[in-house]
Amino acid sequence: MNRIYSLKYCHLTQGLIAVSELASRVSSKTGRKLLAIFIVSALSYGAAEYACAAQMDTRNFWIRDYLDLAQNKGAFQPGAYGVKTPLKNGGEFSFPEVTIPDFSPVSAKGATTAIGNAYSVTASHNGTIHHAIKTQTWGQSDYHYVDRVTKGDFAVQRLDKFVVETAGATEHADFNLSAAEALERYGIEFNGKKQIIGFRVGAGATGVTSYGVGQTYNPLLRSASMFQLNWNNMYASNNTGGFYNEVTGGDSGSGFYLYDNQKKKWVILGTLTGKVFSSKDTWAFFARYDQNTVDILKNTFTQEVNLNGQKMTVNNKNIAINDKITAIELTKSNKNKDLKFHGGGSIELTDNLNSGTGGLIFDEGQHYSVIGKDKAYKGAGVEIGKDTVVDWSVKGEANDNLHKTGAGTLNVNVAQGNNLKTGDGTVFLNAEKAFNAIYVASGRGTVKLGQADALDKNSDYRGIYFTSRGGTLDLNGFSQSFKKIAATDVGTIITNTSDKTATLSLQNPSRYVYHGSITGNTNIEHTGTQKSADSSLIIDGNINTRNDITVRNSQLRLQGHATSHAIFREGPRHCYVPGVLCDKDYVTDFARLESEANKKNNSAYKTNNQVASFDQPDWETRHFRFKTLNLENSEFTTARNSVVEGDIVASNSTLKLGGDVPVFIDMYDGINITGNGFGFRQDVREGRSADDGSSSYTGKITLQKGSTLDINNRFIGGIEAHDSKVNVTSPDALLQNSGVFVNSTLSVRDGGHLTAQKGSTVTAGFRLERKVRFPLSGTPENGADNTWMPVLTYMTEGYDLTGDTLR
């Protein structure tokens, strides 16, 4: 390997890069081409028009494909298997036969990887003063560098708070394996053979074929690489099967992932150091993950406390157990350590406890009580082990966030006066307004109410915000009213596990999309004092409750979800001097570069810089199950990709099941939570999708007082109408139960096909228009083949038949 290179300063990123002085020379002595080394530092970007211009190969892939994979968007949800993506040439690319990794451990700027608790890993040559290292971000939380330990180019870092947005990459590859053993352990099927294939995500200098963007460390432009690993020399080739995204300036420190066939999970291999290249080939090389280095730093920041069921007192200097006093330790760099408790017991604060960058860690399967009259705690957070309960009876410090991790339970018994950020386990709110605001992340955490006013009743969102993958709010028998639920995706779940029924009331005064789900013993209400066209409640998550939904003087719209995708930029390009000195308008350039492929494939949505589009083909089906939907002076629609099961009772209302009904998208879908996690935004758009998609309804509908029902998609069930109208255009409508139409009309038209299996009674009017079918059949008898029970269809006003193709 050529090790002759010069270090050059890059003013763009304030750092040094390694540039080979022999990159194009050939050794006459050996006849072998020498390899050049390029260190893609978190401090480097420039040397390298070569590095950025040849980054993402977009000749046959869309730019968005690389971003979607990195950010687990589109088809690339964590755990998705058998993923295929369309190509610009009209073909299809099949990803390896393995689940898609969860890339949540990757920080927003891509240079670091969370490994659990308050730790992350990167490359040693990434300077600690660089913004991507000094401040590391997951979700809407900033974590600050405290200390680190290195081995070679591998570095493990201590942060100032426990990371709540991800469990982290907690397992690593075994480097003691032979090449054959490694192939068996980490090999996956791809292109007909078993290979060691993995993935990496970074936010280095973004570029596409023949075009450099000029952006580094942009969270929106995090992109993924797929590599093939040579176990013998530990080089990784990124040119794998056509999905080619080369490493570039700013990618250093990003993590490499392999699938462990033994553990059935993705593990971290190491962190990117740089790349080597000859005139023909390029390989990435990395620093191996080193558990010993990780353990050294963790031990440095841990003070063991064996409580073993006893009572302990603590202040900012000492711990006392049975009159034995132990000093609270600091690291050599004068930083606070985590206090790690074992054996359960009681902990009393005799003074306000400020642990600084240290936290409190509680072991598994124990019970602890933390007390201290009018005393407060501040620190890196609390981590509670599985099956452990911590009774928390001390306050928090104002203007601080309490970070809670671990699978155990935190019982909050006094109002904290600060904010909570939680990502795992359960937080039980037993105090009135237990926290000023609550941020729920990762999908692994539950916030459970212990009283009706545990949340902030003066906040439109009740002071609780669900970021990416959300989490669960358990009403626990306490009814709650929201103007809007601050949820960004379907990972948010509002449930009620109590035997006591709770009502979830949504009183949004303006059009609003709830992206999450509602489950459990929960009634749902959306009502107003007078009818308003503005208070439309749109749900594109799921409902699964055995209870009722009540809608009064409003609109309820149930629909599937337009799959959310990565975007390139939020808002207009940044201008230092408006109209004179501006960043490159790469969003417009991306659209230009892919315009020909988009015209050919009718795929403008691929490059329109929107999280979702009406004309995109990928919509996720949502399921809505309930006991009875009660509609009064309201409008109800089901749109594409919705499956609805439950009875409906409608009074003076309009119901449209499928067909040409509006659908809604949220231009901030997936990125609704703002600021430091305690803000919410939406931009709801109404339109028509390119395809109506499929929707279905199963249940009995009762219409009263001038209601109208339009059946435009699959329908199975019964109808009872009083002084109302029913129109059928669906080609697949089955009256499985008796149809009763009292002083009501039934019209089948526009290609409709209605089968009445148990007979019908119509006492107003029955109209069949051209190209429709209205079979009158008996009812199949259970347990008897080809046996049908006779039924009676009775129409007092006769038939109105129009057209010559009626059947």
PLM regions: where:
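Solvent-exposed adhesion/ligand-recognition segments of exported proteins
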Residues: 4-31, 41-48, 53, 247, ...
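Short conserved beta-strand and strand-loop elements enriched in small hydrophobics
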Residues: 128-140, 195-203, 258
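Glycine- and acidic-residue-biased ligand/ion/polar-headgroup-sensing regions
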Residues: 310, 408, 422-430, 441-445, ...
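Extracellular, surface-exposed repeat architectures
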Residues: 337, 341-412, 451-541, 608-628, ...
